[in-house]
Amino acid sequence: MSKKQYKISHFMTTKISLRISSPEEILKDSYGEIIKPETINYRTNKPERNGLFCEKIFGPIKDYECFCGKYKKKLYKEIIRLRQLNKELKVKGLFCNRCGVEITKNTVRRTRMGHINLVVPIVHIWGFRSTPNKIGSILGLSSQQLDMIIYYERYVVIQPGIANSYNNLSIKKLDLLTEEEYTYILNKIPIGNKYLYDNDPNKFIAKMGAECLEELLIRVDLEVLLSDLKKEIKNEESKQRKIELFKRLNVVECFIEGKKKGNKIESIILKVLPVIPPELRPLVPLDGGGYASSDLNDFYRRILIRNNRLKRLIHISAPEIILRNEKRMLQEAVDSLLDNSKKILAVKSESNRPLKSLSDSLKGKQGRFRQNLLGKRVDYSARSVIVVGPKLKLHECGLPKEIAAEIYKPFLIRKLLERKIVRTVKSAKKLISKKDPIIWDILKYLLKGHPVLLNRAPTLHRLGIQSFQPKLIEGKAILLHPLVCSAFNADFDGDQMAVHLPLSNEAILEAKLLMLASQNILNPANGYPITVPSQDMVLGLYYMTKELKSTYESKIKGEGMCFSSLEEVEIAYNNKVVEIHAIIKVKVKILENIGLISKIIKTTVGRVLFNIVVPPKVGYINKLLTNKSLRKIINYILYNTNIPTTAKFLDKIKDLGYYHAFKGGLSFNLNDISIPKEKKSLVKRAIEKVSLVKDNYNLGLITNNERYNQIIDIWTNTNVSLTEKVINYMRKSKQGFNSVYMMLDSGARSSKEQIRQLSGMRGLMAKPQKTSSLGSEIIENPILSNFLEGLSILEYFISTHGARKGLADTALKTADAGYLTRRLVDSAQDVIIQEDDCKTLLGIKISAVKKKEKIIETLSSRVLGRIALNNIYDPTNNNVLIKSSQMIDEKNINLIEKASIDTIEVRSPLTCKSKTGICRKCYGRNLANGLMIQKGEAIGVIAAQSIGEPGTQLTLRTFHVGGTAGNIYEYSKIKAKYDGIIEYEDIQVVKNLVISRSSEIRLLNNHKDKVILMKKKIPYGAKLYVSNKQLVKKNDIICSWDPYNAVIIAEFTGKIRYSNIERDEQTGFKVISERKTPTLKIVNKKNEILKSYNIPVGAHLVVNDGDIINEGSILIKIPIKDLKSGDITGGLPRLSELFEARNDDDDDDYYDSDYYDYYDYSDDDDDYDDYDDYYYNYDDDENDNDNDYDYDYDYDYDYDSDSHNSYSHNSYSPSSNDNYDYDYDSDSDYDSDYDYGDISLNEILDIKGLRAAQKKLINEIQEVYRSQGVKINDKHFEVIVRQMTQKVEIIKSGDTSFLEGNIEYTDVFLEENKRILNMKFIEESGDSKKFFKGQLVNFHELKKENYLLKLSNKNKILFRDVITAISKPIIQGITKAALQTKSFLSAASFQETTKVLYEAAISNKTDYLNGLKENVILGNKIPAGTGLKKSSYEEIIIGDGNQKLKKKDSEINKKLKIENKILK
């Protein structure tokens, strides 16, 4: 294909449609009928005529040679030459008059199709063996009934005719009849019945096989069937039956949609079978004389043999039973060809392997979609082992000469020819293969400005492929820069990497500008630097910047000296006047608020040497360098300078780090590790505490669960104390120059856990078990030995279990993490930045992430790079800090930190109104480069990769956090954050104890404006230490509560009376164990009930029956469920559960219980009250003259002054569980997750609405990652959750085209409601001929028609207002979201390929190629980045063709003018 043709075909593929082929279309595409089952003649080795490889049908095997040998290549070329001489320029196909073969290229054998004329119709297996059953849904037959009809076991009544009422027969349409029943009916009805025409309603017709199904399908009126099903659904009361009817309804709708676009329903019955081109089912000759054949040839042969045999049997009028058996066999043969895996007994080869059918070649990892269309192998690539290249620059890699010579071969040949070193291509190739020295100089020249791409498998995120400037090296291993290892997740223990060469100018330009390693310093997952020194480099930098003081034994050279500049220090160090660790004074420039200021500071020589390579703009960095501080420094330098400066800085610190790690000689020995003396006493004390806990349990003072938990906590605390002792000893040893401590403290290697196991104790171990039950995952007796002492046999045996489980888990989770990433990518691959601003008025509220009031992630780090939704004000003076629609960046983030703002409302992908993709403003900053996101960025794929990439770091099991008991007290009180005045809100108090459910305390500033500085919810039962309108100071305690138990407090003085109470055998406590509505009552002296309390299950009663109590006494304690165990069921299983939006089976249904009010610590005035009515709806405003539609999402639009004051909201978590307080809207109930037992997502969705459910989902997912120390920006989760929540379920369809129970895209739903909004529904058409009953008509047209009818004295049309559809939001799992995407190509290449393709075909779907996958499949440029449709990138890279032509024209005109002047 020429370049011109390629360009045309490339840009023409804008959409692709799929429909069912009719027999006429199959014949039109076919080049001839295949009659014989033979393939190749064993004597001549040539294809058999009219066989499966026939040259007449499919084209010649050799170029321009026919079957009989009349036309050879030379002869054909001569004929063509003669024809061209006769000016017959259009040389059409030339056919051999002997054998009928067209004289053409053999490539036609890849495209030409044949066909088989089937003797009897055959049903396509996808039509009756898929779920839901397509043919069964149309005809109302079950799968078993269909099977009996198709495989010739039963007759089906097509038309009962006279048999319906004749001679006591009661036969209905679609009744199944056995052979005996059929014969009986034929004998009963008159003999003349068979002579009637088929269209005669009195004729009895019953048939079997595909033939009868074809007739039944032709007779079906889909529109009538649709309305019948709708009526049936309306009247149906059984839920199960309704679900089945909905499934049928959906299938019928698909067929109706397809029919409108030209599909024929009867085309699902095959009369002509297409045969694919022979080159796609090859027959390859083997060395031994045999042939290796594609499985498809076997299938086609079976079909042809059976088809021919059936034809012959019909011709000789064989008995019906034999014919029926042959027809069934033919049906089975076609079934096997189309989908062998769907058959109960799959056709197998001689080696008992199921043969690969047409469907199998599309499905799965080895199928056409994933193997050949989405995962192509590429030319110009190489692969080799990687070794470290410490002398390389960040953008360079070392490329072995052999690899370079091979992949740059075409460029090398061109240069050799241009320089006239060789004359022909062949001789150039010889020169290269000889490795002539001359080629290396040319290669060096070629490498300049022509980068290579390096890729390490598995490519989990976009940094798995980066481009480098190659340098020629000797040897066979690729040199890799050590700083890019973390991005590739590479190490030098035998890892291999692939090299790819970008060929076109556009590809080279993109590799240079976008993919160069020095451009990819930041991690797209979180925006932090990923190109950070590690291991040796960190250790070297830590060592050089550590200070060492002189002691009596050893003096440090140069300590206390003063220097005027950094250079002076360097000279002194080079001349060995000062030592690297010496503490000195030096005049440096320090960065302060005003700018760079000169100061004399106390520092070390090593820090001065480090600062020589630091960019001057940044100022002097006087820090001990560790892994964490280096990350912050690199980040700061990157945002305050530029990428080239940062890349140079990274290279310099890499060299410094390696040099000083080598100079320091930082190895370690056994003496660097020692066991603390306090170990014995700590262990002894722990054993005593454990025995005391056991005694308490035996006495019945605590429950078994509490005993277990306390023992685990004792050992955990002991372990922590011991670890601290070990690390303190190391810290003091050699002034902190203990090698092991330096490795730990710098973050170069090791962790506190490993140090603890070396010289403390191994600690608690996991219990060997298959399933993890709550609170029994850990062995109570820890391993008391450490690795220095050595383990006993029992201890060793216990510890081996964990080690082995770890290895098994790693293997399992790698596959799980890969599958999770694939599902995420598929669900979000079409999310691309499409527009600048969607102009939404909605956003989300963000506050700091807290764990028990301890800040885990600050507000500033969470809102960095986001766009402010409204103006952000300073709470103290109401000054605007950040304007609406402004990005929150490093420059203005300090303002937020100083102003002590708790919550900020920002734009979010969750609330973006863009119909396709997301807008720039709602996304904010591109985390990969720190700039505002650009149009065309494929943020869906980036989000999926960012979430999936750390998947392998997550565990597969439940693990114990431990140490919970000691920490809880700190988080069971509220302190004042500022000085101010206390204000009560809905608080009822009995003896300083809160007895109201929705209590709140506000802290106001002591000014006239009374700005709210802090707002906290107060739990029921909390003890108050302040009164209303009281002045408090910062850090004063406002209230406290029991962190272990929720309580119920007596509101009156009186006597206790209760029923349905049981005693705990062990503890003697009264415990509620069954729901017999147990109640506790307070009665007065007259036995009148003052107050009655319902008691929740699991509650402990503190009072006895008949006790006299005072108001404010505690009656009941309800142990908080989460305290039973400090275990986190985390890792991949939990993540998968959340992304698939699965509901837990054991969700506690507190909403339905009578005890719910005891748990409700929510704020009644929260932002989500409106979500109780969570339906999307339209309101038709009759007074609205403009006929504008008003669609209401039921969001709380709040335009009073408070809505702009983001500071006035505060979050508070009274729960003592380990959940993070991850705030998406601090006024919501779910800012604190104060719920006993997990509430399912669907319950939150139903009760609190979509935003609360989205927030809860993101909260839960982030908790899994945070528990493992993985940082991922919220934006990525928001993009995925947006994809999961972009659809609604139709509750009432009204007058729209929707079906109740259908799932629709939100924008489609809103568009449909908008379309019908100004229309009217005709109830009676009157005398109008223009309109009919049930029609939706524009009001103006209706008015006009009624006016005309009135003039003619005719009956007017009666109409009513339209009823719009009502829907509710739903959450779909990522698998479902990926399968139900708008693109059928994308869905088919993900999962359930055959189902997706068949459903697309019957409804004649069109794929508009908006996503990435569908364009990759078709070989188009992906519509992202530089390939974005309607983008300006084309002009930037390729240039505007018209401008070039204009330039050429102007140049030609200039030349002509000059020539004319010369002539004159």
From Swiss-Prot:
Catalytic activity annotated for this protein? RNA(n) + a ribonucleoside 5'-triphosphate = RNA(n+1) + diphosphate
What is the recorded name of this protein? Answer: DNA-directed RNA polymerase subunit beta'
The subunit field of the Swiss-Prot or TrEMBL record says: The RNAP catalytic core consists of 2 alpha, 1 beta, 1 beta' and 1 omega subunit. When a sigma factor is associated with the core the holoenzyme is formed, which can initiate transcription.
Annotated Gene Ontology cellular component terms: DNA-directed RNA polymerase complex
Q: Keyword Metal-binding on this protein?
A: yes
Residue spans of biased composition, Low complexity class: 1204-1219
The residues that the entry says bind Mg(2+) are: 491, 493, 495
Entry's Gene Ontology BP terms:
DNA-templated transcription
Positions contributing to Zn(2+) 2 binding:
838, 912, 919, 922
Give the record's keywords alphabetically: DNA-directed RNA polymerase, Magnesium, Metal-binding, Nucleotidyltransferase, Transcription, Transferase, Zinc
Q: Which taxonomic lineage does the organism of this UniProt entry have?
A: Bacteria, Pseudomonadati, Bacteroidota, Flavobacteriia, Flavobacteriales
Cofactors needed by this protein, per the record, are: Mg(2+); Zn(2+)
